A protein has these predicted regions:
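Long, contiguous binding/interaction regions
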Residues: 1-86
Length: 86
C-alpha cells in the first residue's frame, strides 16, 4: 500500500505582516514540503494583501499535523489538510 497523499491549503490574510511568520514555519518543516505553490492577485496597479499556498507534504502525517496546528495558531492564517488514501 502506498503512503497517503497529503495536501495542505493555507489562506494568508495580510501577507505583508504575516509572511515572515509563515515563511519561518515553512522553513522549519522544509523537509516535509515536496511542492509549494503560492497564489495571489496581482496587476500593474495593485498586489492583493491576501494569498493562498498549496503544499504537497511528505514524510508522514505527524509532522504535517504539527505544521497545521502551528499555522492555524497564527492570527489571520487558516490552514486545512486534505488526505488522499491510495
Amino acid at each position: 500500500m502506498k503512503d497517503d497523499h497529503l495536501i495542505m491549503a493555507v489562506h494568508v490574510t495580510d501577507r505583508l505582516t504575516k509572511a515572515s511568520q509563515v515563511q519561518a514555519l515553512l522553513t522549519e518543516y522544509g523537509c516535509n514540503i515536496k511542492t509549494r505553490l503560492g497564489l495571489h492577485e496581482t496587476g500593474p496597479d495593485a498586489c492583493s494583501p491576501n494569498g493562498i499556498l498549496i503544499l504537497e507534504l511528505v514524510n508522514g502525517a505527524e509532522a504535517c499535523n504539527e505544521l497545521l496546528q502551528k499555522l492555524n495558531a497564527i492570527d489571520g492564517i487558516e490552514a486545512k489538510l486534505v488526505t488522499f488514501s491510495h
